[in-house]
């Protein structure tokens, strides 16, 4: 998920010297806002701008187009069929991808990459930012409950014309689904740039009413792995790739800001502390 880029030269200074920050004093009309959110801990809104990260997004588009796979290490595109990009043009449709330029402790630049949600049933793919939870634990807690839900569905189908029995079964199935979602949300661990960790519930500040998919978008994945890897994000960009979504609100090759419907409520916490890290860069 981390790619080293050449040491900065020219206007950023020779290799080995701390680069000039492009972030100090940035105003909203200077750069496109990549992601933003209100931190419920400090009470402030935090923002990360594009800051030129779109060029890395365009490079990733070229790779996806030429490789036809999320395996970008040089293997043949048919080496891992589940990673093939033609999947994005079928019934599942396309998805968002993200890139983030970061500064490493040694002064080098790193590029992180992420895809939203799962890719063809996979949460983790080499070279891409991982989810905010342990996917093995997710599989473990999901298996048993999903089996119960499936069994209730079969009982519901067999209930036939018994309305009272059907009502009870539907209520039980709904309760099981809600309990499973709470357990899944309980697996998420968010880290910010103060080095503080929080659960999804604490970061959202909204109890158990958390929209499905919160924390699975590109921005949370990228911010989380950057914070945990002691990297300082300099800029981020997200784009859509594949067949347009059913509503037509996403088109291939176009850049979009981070998800406001699901992830804005946690991005404030995740971005908290980044301004101080940027100030350290400026010196």
Task: Locate each region found by the language model.
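Catalytic cores of nucleic-acid editing and processing enzymes
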Residues: 1-283
